[in-house]
């Protein structure tokens, strides 16, 4: 698992994000199958859900035991319930606000990888390594890492 031995939570976050990007670049068909357009009418068998969530658990791990150094926007109602459910599913003692923020970070991360992998930043971004690293660090800031 990328970043397991990294000295800080931020370094683990960086390593795991970079690992996801590297894997996607080396395995674009598999990435597209897992994270691309869903097949209409397809429902994944229940026994595939645990393996499918491993990447999310790995990306969430750097937050374990870290107290957010950022001001959390309060979430209420269904969004708070979603955040609490997500934190419980990950086995992380995160407040709902932090879990919701983590989900937004995942959405951004997978968006960055997908846009690059499928050529949607062609002629816009000339240095994808720097662009990706910049946004990974911005997400780390947002997560309080």
Describe the role of every protein-language-model region:
Residues 1-30, 49-56:
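Hydrophobic alpha-helical connector segments
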Residues 57-145:
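C-terminal peripheral helix-coil segments that are non-catalytic and often amphipathic
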């Amino acid at each position: 698992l990328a970043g397991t031995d990294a000295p800080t939570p931020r370094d683990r976050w960086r390593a795991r994000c970079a690992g996801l990007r590297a894997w996607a670049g080396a395995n674009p068909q598999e990435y597209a199958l897992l994270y691309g357009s869903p097949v209409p009418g397809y429902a994944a068998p229940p026994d595939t859900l645990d393996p499918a969530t491993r990447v999310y658990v790995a990306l969430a791990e750097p937050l374990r035991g870290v107290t957010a150094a950022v001001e959390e926007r309060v979430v209420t109602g269904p969004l708070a319930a979603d955040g609490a459910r997500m934190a419980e599913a990950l086995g992380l003692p995160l407040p709902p606000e932090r879990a919701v923020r983590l989900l937004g970070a995942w959405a951004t991360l997978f968006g960055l990888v997908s846009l690059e992998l499928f050529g949607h930043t062609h002629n816009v971004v000339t240095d994808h390594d720097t662009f990706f690293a910049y946004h990974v660090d911005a997400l780390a800031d947002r997560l309080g890492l």
